């Protein structure tokens, strides 16, 4: 068996068959072809890139390859589409065209290698395939290398006479399509060992084993190698700890040239007794069974002899005929089954040295993809958001987020999706199918992700940890929502009123206020709620129920959130930090209110006078000025206040308590605000400045009174004579004049 070529793993479609494929199936075809090509590249089996791969990477139709003038020449990279174009009339012309393009006016007889080669015409060879013999006077391996790398001699069968051993090697590059002979045609024969080789580069490497030429050194295994292409292949095989040994000569080779023997793993064909030592050759072998039969496809009423057509039938019927014997999973493609079966259940033999990631699949393709992620090589990048992907198909699906395209539509409800897998999952809602079952409790789920999340309830594992507060979650979505508590992000905005929310579910519930849909009303006060749980919590206000109790101090709360905030008093935790000044708070509402000191936002407005406030509590207290309400009454003297803080400060006048002391002069005060304003006498600070005249004051009340001199406002009116004043102190002083008159 020869070296695996791109043609061996390529899938062919006729033009008629290609036109019947859906866009998703074409994308699948392109991904499979590109992935097969990358597999060959990772194993060092491809010399240069086929035309078909170039077109597929540019997301062009494969049939556009036929419109190109340039024809692929070398057989191991020969495009199976361009091959059809090489008829007897065009082969010689195409060959001459390639020669002239690369070497100017030089013809076949005047190549730059002619100093080392003698050209002898072989008699009896006519037609397109011009058989020529080259006698090698002085062997130079670099000449052979350049000869084949330039792809000059690929279209004609050649013979090479090696003077040192007087052995003749023949090479044929074109496949006789009518007779279906082997793609490689004639073999290279090395008489000294009677071993057949498929390509001259392999012959040269084998020759070097006997000659003893070893020019390339491997740093990993301290081995010396025979050819320039060997180090790459050797390092890959050394990395995977796989070597192939020739039993006849007991020489170790890094390419599978002769009898292959894989030490770690083998792949057995389900349809015959064939055992392959490489996954790619196992895939190649399976195509033999497909080509041996002809499948009848009733939908198009034609016989299909290619595996691609059989796959089309399977796609139409939604069949999954390939079943895994180990886990019972069914797949619609033999390739998928093969890849699925070679995944070990426990061991992870492949580890990428850059990031330390371990892979289940013992294949260099997965290491190549991880290398692309780490190094940024060969990634497909989105032009809209610069996000990168290792597969072009993933990029195409991602771009639908920006374009809004949703090509996959549900026939039951008409809902559309941008990805076929989303549609498959959605269909389970209608069918009730739940293929993912928990082994612990037997509960079934329609998505594998739901099963994975459910299994954490049994293990108690919480993989997702917050970097700010170290809180852990079983679901990544819960962590994302939690992180918005720290960042203050509220991405969900109501189009009706502009209110923002941190969760989409909260926005959905809020919208019901505007639509009036399914509102839950309190039987006591008729207050409506969009969520039933919110109604239950609200009813505790009327019942006085406080089910959440603090274990530290025994204090009870009607809401769990209040208990959580209360716990932070005991722990001293302040997880909410202001980015502007680094001040921390124990609850998110405190941070939200604090931010308004930086932004100057005042969202709460008094309906009576239009005055705006940063805090809702301030506007509530302010309204009491208009209503005259003073709900806070001193039990000692009966004096009432419209602020609770005023009552607290007043009560200290009865107790004599003065907890706030000035460090400069030792003077004590019964209010924190009094101490703050007192300190300005020592510092000379006057933070309150008039916008009209620029005059500054050390007290806010002084600035408020001063502004009334500009506006003419006099809110304090004497009930005796009707005289008005702009300051309360002026009114009090004026009222004393009336009391003196009475005395």
Curated annotation (Swiss-Prot):
Gene3D superfamilies the UniProt entry points to: 6.10.140.140, Classic Zinc Finger (3.30.160.60)
Family the entry assigns: Belongs to the krueppel C2H2-type zinc-finger protein family.
Subcellular localization(s) per the UniProt record: Nucleus
Gene field: ZNF267
Function summary: May be involved in transcriptional regulation.
Single GO cellular component term: nucleus
Keywords annotated in UniProt: DNA-binding, Isopeptide bond, Metal-binding, Nucleus, Repeat, Transcription, Transcription regulation, Ubl conjugation, Zinc, Zinc-finger
Covalent cross-link (Glycyl lysine isopeptide (Lys-Gly) (interchain with G-Cter in SUMO2)), residues: 66, 135
ZnF (C2H2-type) residues: 267-289, 322-340, 380-402, 408-430, 436-458, 464-486, 492-514, 520-542, 548-570, 576-598, 604-626, 632-654, 660-682, 688-710, 716-738
Coarse class of the protein's main subcellular location: nucleus
GO BP field: regulation of transcription by RNA polymerase II
Database matches in SUPFAM superfamilies: beta-beta-alpha zinc fingers, KRAB domain (Kruppel-associated box)
Keyword Metal-binding: yes
A Gene Ontology molecular function term of the record: zinc ion binding
Organism: Homo sapiens
Record-given protein name: Zinc finger protein 267
Domain KRAB: 4-75
Higher taxonomy: Eukaryota, Metazoa, Chordata, Craniata, Vertebrata
Pfam families, per the entry: KRAB, zf-C2H2
């Amino acid at each position: 068996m020869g070296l695996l070529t791109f043609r061996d793993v390529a899938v062919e479609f006729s033009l008629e068959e290609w036109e019947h494929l859906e866009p998703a199936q074409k994308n699948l075809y392109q991904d499979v072809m590109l992935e097969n090509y990358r597999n060959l590249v990772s194993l060092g089996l491809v010399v240069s890139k086929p035309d078909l791969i170039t077109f597929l990477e540019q997301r062009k139709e494969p049939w556009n390859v036929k419109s190109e003038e340039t024809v692929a020449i070398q057989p191991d990279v020969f495009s199976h589409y361009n091959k059809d174009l090489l008829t007897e009339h065009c082969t010689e012309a195409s060959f001459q065209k390639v020669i002239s393009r690369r070497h100017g006016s030089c013809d076949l007889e005047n190549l730059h290698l002619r100093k080392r080669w003698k050209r002898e015409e072989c008699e009896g060879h006519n037609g397109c395939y011009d058989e020529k013999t080259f006698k090698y006077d002085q062997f130079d391996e670099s000449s052979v290398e350049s000869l084949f790398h330039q792809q000059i001699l690929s279209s004609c069968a050649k013979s090479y006479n090696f003077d040192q051993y007087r052995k003749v090697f023949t090479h044929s590059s074109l496949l006789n399509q009518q007779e279906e002979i082997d793609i490689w045609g004639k073999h290279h024969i090395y008489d000294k060992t009677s071993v057949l080789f498929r390509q001259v580069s392999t012959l040269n490497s084998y020759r070097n084993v006997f000659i003893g030429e070893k020019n390339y050194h491997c740093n990993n295994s301290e081995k010396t190698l025979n050819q320039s292409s060997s180090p790459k292949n050797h390092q890959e095989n050394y990395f995977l700890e796989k070597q192939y040994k020739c039993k006849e000569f007991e020489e170790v080779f890094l390419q599978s040239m002769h009898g292959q023997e894989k030490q770690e793993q083998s792949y057995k064909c389900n349809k015959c007794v064939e055992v392959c030592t490489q996954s790619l050759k196992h895939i190649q072998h399976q195509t033999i069974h497909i080509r041996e039969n002809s499948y009848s496809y009733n939908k198009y009423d034609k016989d299909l002899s290619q595996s691609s057509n059989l796959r089309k039938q399977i796609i139409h019927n939604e069949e999954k005929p390939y079943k895994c014997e180990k886990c019972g999973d069914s797949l619609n493609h033999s390739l998928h089954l093969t890849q699925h079966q070679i995944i070990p259940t426990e061991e992870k033999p492949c580890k990428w040295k850059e990031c330390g990631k371990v892979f289940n699949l013992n294949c260099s393709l997965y290491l190549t993809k991880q290398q692309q992620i780490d190094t940024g090589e060969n990634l497909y990048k989105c032009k809209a958001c610069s996000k990168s992907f290792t597969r072009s198909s993933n990029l195409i699906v991602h771009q639908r987020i920006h374009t809004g395209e949703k090509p996959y539509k549900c026939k039951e409800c008409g809902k559309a999706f941008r990805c076929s897998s989303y549609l498959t999952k959605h269909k389970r809602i209608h069918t009730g199918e739940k293929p993912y079952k928990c082994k612990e409790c037997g509960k079934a789920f329609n998505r594998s992700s739901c099963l994975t999340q459910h299994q954490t309830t049994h293990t108690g594992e919480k993989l997702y940890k917050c970097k700010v507060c170290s809180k852990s979650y079983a679901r990544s979505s819960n962590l994302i929502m939690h992180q918005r508590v720290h960042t203050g992000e509220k991405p969900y905005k109501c189009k009706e009123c502009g209110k923002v929310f941190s969760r989409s579910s909260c926005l959905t519930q809020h919208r019901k206020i505007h639509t009036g849909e399914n509102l839950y009303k309190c039987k006591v006060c008729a207050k409506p709620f969009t969520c039933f749980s919110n109604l239950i919590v609200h009813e505790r206000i009327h019942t006085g129920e406080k089910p959440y109790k603090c274990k530290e101090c025994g204090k009870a709360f009607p809401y769990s959130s209040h208990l959580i905030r209360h716990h932070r008093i005991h722990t001293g935790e302040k997880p909410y930090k202001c980015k502007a000044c680094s001040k921390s708070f124990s609850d998110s509402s405190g941070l939200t209110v604090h931010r308004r000191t930086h932004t100057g936002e005042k969202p709460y407005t008094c309906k009576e006078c239009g005055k705006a406030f940063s805090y809702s509590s301030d506007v509530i207290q302010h309204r009491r000025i208009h209503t005259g309400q003073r709900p806070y009454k001193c039990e000692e003297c009966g004096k009432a206040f419209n602020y609770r803080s005023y009552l607290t400060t007043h009560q200290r006048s009865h107790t004599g308590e003065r907890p706030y002391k000035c460090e400069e002069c030792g003077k004590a005060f019964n209010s924190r605000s009094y101490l703050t304003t007192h300190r300005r006498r020592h510092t000379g600070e006057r933070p309150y400045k008039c916008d009209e005249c620029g005059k500054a004051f050390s007290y806010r009340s002084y600035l408020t009174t001063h502004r009334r001199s500009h506006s003419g406002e006099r809110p304090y009116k004497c009930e005796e004579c009707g005289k008005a004043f702009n300051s309360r102190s002026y009114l009090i002083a004026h009222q004393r004049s009336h009391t003196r008159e009475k005395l």
